[in-house]
A protein has these predicted regions:
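Soluble extracytoplasmic domains of inner/organellar membrane proteins
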Residues: 124, 132-178
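A short, flexible N-terminal coil/short beta segment enriched in small residues
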Residues: 18-22, 90-95, 99
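The canonical Cys-X-X-Cys-His
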Residues: 63-72, 84-94, 140-146, 163-170, ...
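Primarily the internal scaffold of c-type cytochrome electron-transfer domains
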Residues: 4-6, 94-126, 173-215
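N-terminal export/targeting leaders of redox proteins
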Residues: 1-52, 56-60, 64, 68, ...
Length: 215
Protein backbone atom coordinates (compact mmCIF):
# COMPACT_ATOMS: atom_id res chain seq x y z
CA UNK A 1 0.00 0.00 0.00
CA UNK A 2 1.54 3.31 -1.02
CA UNK A 3 2.24 5.88 1.70
CA UNK A 4 -0.32 8.66 1.87
CA UNK A 5 2.02 11.15 3.55
CA UNK A 6 5.52 12.05 2.54
CA UNK A 7 8.27 10.81 4.89
CA UNK A 8 9.04 14.43 5.83
CA UNK A 9 5.63 14.60 7.55
CA UNK A 10 7.09 12.87 10.63
CA UNK A 11 9.64 15.63 11.08
CA UNK A 12 6.97 18.27 10.50
CA UNK A 13 4.73 16.68 13.14
CA UNK A 14 7.55 16.69 15.70
CA UNK A 15 8.35 20.33 14.96
CA UNK A 16 4.66 21.21 15.35
CA UNK A 17 4.37 19.42 18.70
CA UNK A 18 7.59 20.85 20.10
CA UNK A 19 6.69 24.27 18.77
CA UNK A 20 3.26 24.15 20.42
CA UNK A 21 4.84 23.17 23.75
CA UNK A 22 7.41 25.96 23.45
CA UNK A 23 4.78 28.56 22.60
CA UNK A 24 2.58 27.35 25.48
CA UNK A 25 5.43 27.64 27.97
CA UNK A 26 6.40 31.04 26.57
CA UNK A 27 2.83 32.33 26.86
CA UNK A 28 2.62 31.06 30.44
CA UNK A 29 5.90 32.83 31.29
CA UNK A 30 4.66 36.07 29.70
CA UNK A 31 1.38 35.84 31.65
CA UNK A 32 3.21 35.33 34.96
CA UNK A 33 5.62 38.21 34.29
CA UNK A 34 2.79 40.53 33.23
CA UNK A 35 0.88 39.64 36.38
CA UNK A 36 3.90 40.64 38.48
CA UNK A 37 4.76 43.73 36.45
CA UNK A 38 3.98 47.32 37.42
CA UNK A 39 1.57 47.39 34.48
CA UNK A 40 -0.69 45.09 36.50
CA UNK A 41 0.27 45.82 40.12
CA UNK A 42 0.68 49.60 39.82
CA UNK A 43 4.02 49.46 41.62
CA UNK A 44 6.33 52.49 41.12
CA UNK A 45 3.64 54.41 39.23
CA UNK A 46 3.30 58.03 40.40
CA UNK A 47 -0.24 59.36 40.22
CA UNK A 48 -0.96 63.05 39.80
CA UNK A 49 -3.25 64.32 42.53
CA UNK A 50 -5.64 67.31 42.58
CA UNK A 51 -3.21 68.99 45.01
CA UNK A 52 0.57 68.71 44.74
CA UNK A 53 1.01 67.30 48.23
CA UNK A 54 4.57 66.27 49.08
CA UNK A 55 5.13 63.75 51.86
CA UNK A 56 8.84 64.51 51.57
CA UNK A 57 8.16 68.10 52.57
CA UNK A 58 5.58 67.44 55.27
CA UNK A 59 7.03 64.25 56.78
CA UNK A 60 10.69 64.29 55.81
CA UNK A 61 11.44 68.01 56.14
CA UNK A 62 8.86 69.21 58.67
CA UNK A 63 8.67 66.00 60.71
CA UNK A 64 4.88 65.73 60.82
CA UNK A 65 3.83 62.39 62.31
CA UNK A 66 1.78 60.02 60.12
CA UNK A 67 -1.00 60.00 62.70
CA UNK A 68 -1.60 63.74 62.48
CA UNK A 69 -3.30 63.20 59.11
CA UNK A 70 -4.07 59.48 59.17
CA UNK A 71 -5.85 59.62 62.50
CA UNK A 72 -7.54 56.20 62.52
CA UNK A 73 -4.52 54.08 61.59
CA UNK A 74 -4.24 52.68 65.14
CA UNK A 75 -7.94 52.06 65.70
CA UNK A 76 -9.61 51.12 62.40
CA UNK A 77 -9.19 49.12 59.23
CA UNK A 78 -8.62 52.28 57.21
CA UNK A 79 -5.80 54.66 58.07
CA UNK A 80 -8.15 57.52 57.20
CA UNK A 81 -7.73 60.51 54.91
CA UNK A 82 -7.53 63.97 56.47
CA UNK A 83 -10.27 66.49 55.91
CA UNK A 84 -9.29 69.91 54.61
CA UNK A 85 -9.90 71.18 58.14
CA UNK A 86 -6.70 69.36 59.07
CA UNK A 87 -4.83 70.98 56.19
CA UNK A 88 -6.12 74.43 57.09
CA UNK A 89 -4.94 74.12 60.69
CA UNK A 90 -1.55 75.07 59.27
CA UNK A 91 -2.36 76.64 55.93
CA UNK A 92 -4.52 79.42 57.32
CA UNK A 93 -1.17 80.96 58.23
CA UNK A 94 1.39 79.14 56.05
CA UNK A 95 1.19 79.50 52.25
CA UNK A 96 -2.24 80.97 52.83
CA UNK A 97 -2.34 82.62 49.38
CA UNK A 98 -0.51 79.96 47.36
CA UNK A 99 -2.28 79.13 44.07
CA UNK A 100 -1.26 75.50 44.56
CA UNK A 101 -3.52 75.32 47.61
CA UNK A 102 -6.62 76.84 46.03
CA UNK A 103 -8.32 73.40 45.77
CA UNK A 104 -7.76 73.00 49.53
CA UNK A 105 -9.21 76.43 50.31
CA UNK A 106 -12.17 75.78 47.98
CA UNK A 107 -12.87 72.48 49.72
CA UNK A 108 -12.65 74.20 53.11
CA UNK A 109 -15.11 76.90 52.03
CA UNK A 110 -17.66 74.60 50.41
CA UNK A 111 -17.30 71.52 52.58
CA UNK A 112 -16.86 69.36 49.46
CA UNK A 113 -14.03 66.82 49.97
CA UNK A 114 -11.08 66.76 47.61
CA UNK A 115 -11.29 63.79 45.25
CA UNK A 116 -7.89 62.20 45.79
CA UNK A 117 -6.68 59.50 43.40
CA UNK A 118 -6.26 56.22 45.28
CA UNK A 119 -2.69 54.91 45.16
CA UNK A 120 -2.88 51.71 47.23
CA UNK A 121 -5.98 50.09 45.79
CA UNK A 122 -6.62 46.56 47.02
CA UNK A 123 -9.24 44.38 45.29
CA UNK A 124 -12.71 44.32 46.83
CA UNK A 125 -12.28 40.63 47.67
CA UNK A 126 -9.27 41.33 49.90
CA UNK A 127 -9.56 42.59 53.48
CA UNK A 128 -6.79 44.58 55.12
CA UNK A 129 -6.86 46.14 58.59
CA UNK A 130 -4.29 48.84 59.35
CA UNK A 131 -4.82 48.79 63.12
CA UNK A 132 -4.08 45.06 63.44
CA UNK A 133 -0.80 45.35 61.56
CA UNK A 134 0.29 48.46 63.48
CA UNK A 135 -0.42 46.79 66.83
CA UNK A 136 1.62 43.76 65.75
CA UNK A 137 4.67 45.86 64.94
CA UNK A 138 4.44 46.23 61.18
CA UNK A 139 5.96 49.58 60.25
CA UNK A 140 4.43 52.02 57.77
CA UNK A 141 7.56 51.86 55.63
CA UNK A 142 7.37 48.06 55.44
CA UNK A 143 4.39 48.31 53.09
CA UNK A 144 4.44 51.93 51.91
CA UNK A 145 8.18 52.41 51.49
CA UNK A 146 10.00 55.60 52.45
CA UNK A 147 7.01 57.90 52.21
CA UNK A 148 9.12 60.60 53.84
CA UNK A 149 11.28 60.69 50.69
CA UNK A 150 8.44 60.83 48.14
CA UNK A 151 7.43 64.10 46.50
CA UNK A 152 4.56 62.26 44.87
CA UNK A 153 3.26 59.11 46.51
CA UNK A 154 3.62 55.90 44.57
CA UNK A 155 2.98 52.27 45.45
CA UNK A 156 6.34 50.98 46.69
CA UNK A 157 5.27 47.34 47.06
CA UNK A 158 3.48 45.05 44.57
CA UNK A 159 0.65 44.26 47.05
CA UNK A 160 0.22 40.83 45.47
CA UNK A 161 -0.91 37.79 47.44
CA UNK A 162 2.59 36.34 47.08
CA UNK A 163 4.07 39.49 48.61
CA UNK A 164 1.61 39.45 51.54
CA UNK A 165 2.25 35.76 52.22
CA UNK A 166 6.01 36.32 52.37
CA UNK A 167 5.39 38.33 55.53
CA UNK A 168 2.57 36.20 56.91
CA UNK A 169 4.76 33.10 56.66
CA UNK A 170 7.86 34.79 58.07
CA UNK A 171 6.73 37.71 60.28
CA UNK A 172 9.97 37.63 62.27
CA UNK A 173 11.78 39.08 59.25
CA UNK A 174 9.65 42.22 59.15
CA UNK A 175 8.27 42.97 62.61
CA UNK A 176 9.67 45.86 64.63
CA UNK A 177 9.13 47.36 68.11
CA UNK A 178 5.75 49.09 68.35
CA UNK A 179 7.37 52.39 69.27
CA UNK A 180 9.23 52.31 65.94
CA UNK A 181 6.21 51.62 63.72
CA UNK A 182 5.95 55.24 62.56
CA UNK A 183 9.70 55.77 62.28
CA UNK A 184 10.39 55.81 58.55
CA UNK A 185 14.16 55.57 58.97
CA UNK A 186 14.13 52.63 61.39
CA UNK A 187 16.64 49.86 60.68
CA UNK A 188 16.95 46.88 63.04
CA UNK A 189 20.48 46.21 64.27
CA UNK A 190 19.90 42.48 64.79
CA UNK A 191 16.60 41.42 63.21
CA UNK A 192 17.54 37.72 63.41
CA UNK A 193 17.40 37.94 67.21
CA UNK A 194 14.86 40.74 67.65
CA UNK A 195 12.25 39.42 65.20
CA UNK A 196 11.56 36.04 66.84
CA UNK A 197 11.49 37.69 70.29
CA UNK A 198 8.90 40.27 69.19
CA UNK A 199 6.79 37.62 67.44
CA UNK A 200 6.57 35.73 70.72
CA UNK A 201 6.07 38.86 72.84
CA UNK A 202 3.30 40.28 70.62
CA UNK A 203 1.63 36.91 70.07
CA UNK A 204 1.97 37.07 66.30
CA UNK A 205 0.66 33.99 64.51
CA UNK A 206 1.62 32.85 61.03
CA UNK A 207 -1.81 33.34 59.47
CA UNK A 208 -1.95 31.90 55.96
CA UNK A 209 -5.53 30.63 55.77
CA UNK A 210 -7.54 32.00 52.84
CA UNK A 211 -10.30 33.24 55.17
CA UNK A 212 -7.89 35.58 56.99
CA UNK A 213 -7.94 38.02 54.08
CA UNK A 214 -10.77 36.75 51.87
CA UNK A 215 -14.23 36.62 53.41
Amino acid sequence: MPQIFHHSTNALAKITIYGAVFIGVALLWVAVELNRSSWNTGQWVEKQQPVQFSHKHHVGDDGIDCRYCHTSVETAASAGMPSTNTCMNCHKQIWADSPYLEPVRASFRTGKPIEWIRVHDLPDYSYFNHSIHVKQGVGCATCHGRIDQMNFVYQASPLTMEWCLNCHRNPEKYIRPREEVFNMAYVAKNQEVLGPRLVKEYGVNKLTSCSVCHY
